[in-house]
Amino acid sequence: MRTHYSSDINEKLQGQKVTVCGWVHRRRDHGGVIFLDIRDRTGLVQLVFNPDNDNFKVADSLRSEFVIKAEGVVNLRPEGQENKNISSGKVEIIGDSIEVINKSKTIPFQLDDFQSTGEDVKLKYRYIDLRRPEMQHKLITRSKAIRYVRNFLDNNGFLDIETPFLTKATPEGARDYLVPSRNFNGKFYALPQSPQLFKQLLMVSGFDRYYQIVKCFRDEDLRADRQPEFTQIDIEASFIDEAFIMSTMERMIAGLFKETIGVEFATPFQVMTFADAIDKYGSDKPDLRIPLEFVNIKEDMQNEEFKVFSGPANDPQSRVIALRIPGGNDKLTRKMIDEYTKFVGIYGAKGLAYIKINSLSQGKEGLQSPIVKNISEETLFKVIEKTSAKEGDLLFFGAGKAKIVNDSMGALRAKIGEDLDLFNKDWAPLWVVDFPMFEKDDNRLYAMHHPFTAPKVSSVEDLVNTNPEELSSRAYDMVINGYEVGGGSIRIHKQDIQAKVFNLLGISDDEAREKFGFMLDALSYGTPIHGGIAFGVDRLIMLLTGTTNIRDVIAFPKTQTASCLMTEAPSTVSLEQLNELGIAVKKEER
């Protein structure tokens, strides 16, 4: 139907007849001449119809979002009327003929006025919202990124192998989406939270290198960077170690960013231990573009009478830290400090102490804060020395249980970095390694990553004789600008170690056999050393396109209640369907 896309129309085609198809983006009548901006996925091109044209009446009748096909001759625009904002801006098409393929009702919102349109309206009419050039750019970038990844992995010997969507429920932390079986009454499939076990079984099968661009499903409470269904770049390889995975993935991600948006990452990426990340930034996914670090002052506060600090300072499960904000005296108002106090309260902090450093030569008198009177001058100036604070700086303090301090002050660090625009570079990729094998909650151990991550032990005897809370794992996460974009590990490849890890997690032998018997059996039939990683496609595309909402990079996303406003899913089904599946719906009591 067409000879060219809009972006193909340029001065090289001057005098040539072309055919274009698309939507009427804008219609203007200037002195009896009709100007039409025609939009397709590549951009805009201007179409001109003069009054003496046989199709002038048709052109005059067009309205926004009509779908048309037009023929005409490419002509240079009059001098001074070029449009530098579009690739076809030096030319226009002098229309010969035009065909209305389809009319359009008045759309629910104007594409140029999307910012004043509610999110619910845009999701209900997603097919309209996706016509916006900004949205099309994001999804085109997604397509290019996935194509690059496929080519890279194909060229490096990885095989694209599909794994099942209807599988066994083996909870991995979040709730499963369950699918009832019609053939086996009362039994259910689960939609996979990841292809974890299947990709390991492919290594047992001898395929050596595997990848898949795959949908995964988690029935969990949603955030701005989460969706119930999401896409992973899933990767596994045999006879490898951490260095192989990390170096290969660095090449892939560095190449992806260069190819897609022209950004060059220095390799190898910085490597940081989990312990260092928590100690310095309160987070296992720190944004290293922000030049603010925690300073531990626990020992300095142990003998102070100020119980807010000395209490946690003498508690092994707590920490006391200072966070220096250079020039914070002038940059942070009292109102902002009050807002930050409320902000850290979201994470469980009981308050936010601070000290403004007005003068270093006046002793305590040069320090401004409600807490100054409660702490000795000697300790105050030790803290100032430790933090390298200068006149005009402001110190924030976190004191309490380690998790609360890490979460609250880590979030505060990121917020201040954004509020004050402290970013010292555009991109900061790194690896976080040496994660704890387990984390403890309610006096029970949980896998920090998942139960198939290999611990840093060489035998089951080492595993038995080591305090589980002191075990490190062979896990690694890739972090870019504060986002965990990928996570993986070397896997357990010996049956006795896997069985013991299940045991440490409180999974009985019978339960392990019921849920993971097929995996335990496979590990007894000659399993190679293997490991892998999974990248969140949606998060990567967020970074590549500069958006902060995952819904912007998915064609048809769900809301924060996991519903689709466009199709009205989830929906009820007929009683006949329920009876066929042997399911009775329990009505919610109100």
Curated annotation (Swiss-Prot):
Q: Which GO terms describe its biological process?
A: aspartyl-tRNA aminoacylation
Per UniProt, which keywords does this protein have?
Aminoacyl-tRNA synthetase, ATP-binding, Cytoplasm, Ligase, Nucleotide-binding, Protein biosynthesis
Reactions the enzyme catalyzes: tRNA(Asx) + L-aspartate + ATP = L-aspartyl-tRNA(Asx) + AMP + diphosphate
Pfam families assigned: GAD, tRNA-synt_2, tRNA_anti-codon
Q: Which PROSITE patterns match?
A: AA_TRNA_LIGASE_II (PS50862)
Any one Gene Ontology MF annotation carried by this entry is:
aspartate-tRNA ligase activity
Q: Cross-referenced NCBIfam families, in alphabetical order?
A: aspS_bact, PRK00476.1
Protein name per UniProt: Aspartate--tRNA(Asp/Asn) ligase
Record the organism.
Answer: Francisella tularensis subsp. tularensis (strain WY96-3418)
